[in-house]
């Protein structure tokens, strides 16, 4: 095998690979063995005609397609390894020369991993990130717990007031016609919750059980449905029942009922501690992100478009998986958000480019600093993943994970170690 390498443009190379005629003939014979049974030649049983007869009857090129594939599968990986070429996508293969008794020559044009010029990555200055737990946040959490433990009872007499729960039947009309999704029976709505559009809920205040009313509202311009966006609508509403919520008192008894604590003060203290922990983790994550962004700003990379497109495709697949868990699909998502595949991909583009750039920088720093994942770290990471799967035999599952996902685990571990290095060497400023 002979290989010539030509730089076509930035991050794109063309390899001209020559396979000697003897090797190519072996590939043709391999192709013949694979396809022999499909050839039907007069005077021979199907699949029994010899190679020289097949070439004569069908022409020598009949076996070239698979022969080309066999040659490329064998020689292309060796060619890129020998020339230290790191492709980011599949190559474009073009045949230069092919024929009986000739060397097989082909070109492989491929986009390569770009050069990363690191700037300063140790000692970057990043603004300190910190959060304080406000008393109001603690009180809001207590109110939320109060709401979850409210007692609900029927309101035997009287009108709907804010804070009441109305059980209603409704049917909506736009342009005088009923629309899909605009009708429900025995629907519970808390007045003042903002569940419905516009002032729908406010217009129910003052109504009594069994009373009906026409409620007039307008859909928001960006409601998410082309047939409803910005349009006025009329709803025929009937009050079936009215319920009232009784909130429990915020006292020591409440704390005992909803938690492991004996006093309200102990419950408040626990809520505050949990919030402090959450905010501390949030501040840490934001600081780490700011450090990486500062390092990225100092680096120079010309990212090939194909890498960004591949990352966008990965992001779309992730979105599709998340939607599937919710019982939805991409088509429904596009309709609901008044979007399209093209719009969503364009929206993802900036994030995709940022991710690719960050990954390349982290890999380059790992290379410069000689940061690697040890076998022990791989095992520990796999054990963590195995525990998340809830498997009984954790060690066996971890072993399978290492074998199947070693490359992904290594990247995760190495990136984590690089991040620790960057944060440890950063300068926190006020």
Swiss-Prot record:
Recorded family membership: Belongs to the FKBP-type PPIase family. Tig subfamily.
Domain PPIase FKBP-type, residue spans: 163-248
Catalysed transformations (reactions): [protein]-peptidylproline (omega=180) = [protein]-peptidylproline (omega=0)
Listed GO biological process terms: 'de novo' cotranslational protein folding; cell division; chaperone-mediated protein folding; protein transport; protein unfolding
Entry's localization field: Cytoplasm
Protein name: Trigger factor
Keywords: Cell cycle, Cell division, Chaperone, Cytoplasm, Isomerase, Rotamase
Major location category of this protein: cytoplasm
Functional summary from the UniProt entry: Involved in protein export. Acts as a chaperone by maintaining the newly synthesized protein in an open conformation. Functions as a peptidyl-prolyl cis-trans isomerase.
InterPro entries named among the record's database cross-references: PPIase_dom_sf, PPIase_FKBP_dom, Trig_fac, Trigger_fac_C, Trigger_fac_C_sf, Trigger_fac_ribosome-bd_bac, Trigger_fac_ribosome-bd_sf, Trigger_fact/SurA_dom_sf
E.C. no: 5.2.1.8
Domain notes: Consists of 3 domains; the N-terminus binds the ribosome, the middle domain has PPIase activity, while the C-terminus has intrinsic chaperone activity on its own.
Gene Ontology MF terms: peptidyl-prolyl cis-trans isomerase activity; protein folding chaperone; ribosome binding
One annotated Gene Ontology cellular component of this protein: cytoplasm
């Amino acid at each position: 095998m002979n290989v010539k390498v030509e730089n076509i443009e930035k991050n794109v190379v063309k390899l001209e690979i020559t396979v000697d005629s003897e090797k190519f003939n072996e590939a043709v014979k391999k192709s013949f063995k694979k396809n022999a049974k499909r050839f039907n030649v007069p005077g021979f049983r199907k699949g029994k005609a010899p190679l020289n007869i097949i070439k004569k009857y069908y022409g020598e090129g009949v076996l070239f397609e698979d022969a080309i594939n066999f040659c490329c599968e064998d020689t292309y990986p060796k060619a890129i390894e020998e020339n230290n070429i790191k492709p980011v996508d599949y190559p474009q293969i073009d045949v230069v020369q092919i024929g009986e008794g000739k060397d097989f020559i082909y070109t492989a044009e491929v986009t390569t991993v770009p050069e990363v010029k690191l700037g300063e990555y140790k000692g970057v200055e990043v603004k300190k990130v910190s959060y304080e737990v406000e008393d109001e946040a603690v009180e809001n959490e207590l109110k939320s717990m109060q709401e979850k433990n409210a007692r609900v009872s029927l309101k035997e007499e009287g009108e709907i007031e804010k804070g009441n729960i109305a059980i209603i039947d409704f049917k909506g009309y736009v342009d005088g016609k009923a629309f899909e999704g605009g009708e429900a029976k025995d629907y519970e709505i808390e007045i003042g919750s903002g569940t419905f559009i516009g002032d729908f809920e406010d217009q129910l205040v003052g109504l009594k059980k069994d009373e009906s009313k026409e409620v007039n509202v307008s859909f928001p311009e960006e409601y998410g449905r082309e047939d409803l966006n910005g349009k006025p609508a009329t709803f025929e509403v009937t009050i079936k029942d009215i319920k009232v919520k009784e909130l429990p008192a915020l006292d020591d008894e409440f704390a005992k009922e909803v938690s492991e604590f004996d006093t309200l003060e102990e419950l408040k203290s626990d809520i505050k501690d949990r919030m402090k922990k959450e905010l501390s983790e949030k501040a840490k994550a934001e600081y780490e992100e700011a450090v990486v962004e500062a390092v990225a700003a100092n680096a120079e990379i010309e990212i090939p478009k194909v890498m960004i497109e591949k990352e966008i495709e990965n992001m779309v697949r992730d979105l599709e998986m998340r939607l599937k868990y919710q019982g939805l699909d991409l088509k429904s998502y596009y309709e609901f958000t008044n979007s399209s595949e093209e719009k969503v991909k364009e929206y993802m583009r900036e994030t995709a480019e940022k991710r690719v750039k960050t990954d390349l920088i982290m890999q380059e720093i790992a290379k410069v600093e000689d940061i690697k994942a040890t076998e022990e770290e791989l095992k520990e990471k796999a054990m963590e993943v195995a525990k998340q799967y809830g498997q009984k035999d954790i060690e066996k599952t971890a072993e399978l994970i290492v074998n199947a996902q070693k490359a992904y685990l290594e990247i995760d571990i190495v990136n984590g170690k690089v991040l620790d290095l960057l944060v440890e060497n950063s300068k926190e400023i006020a």
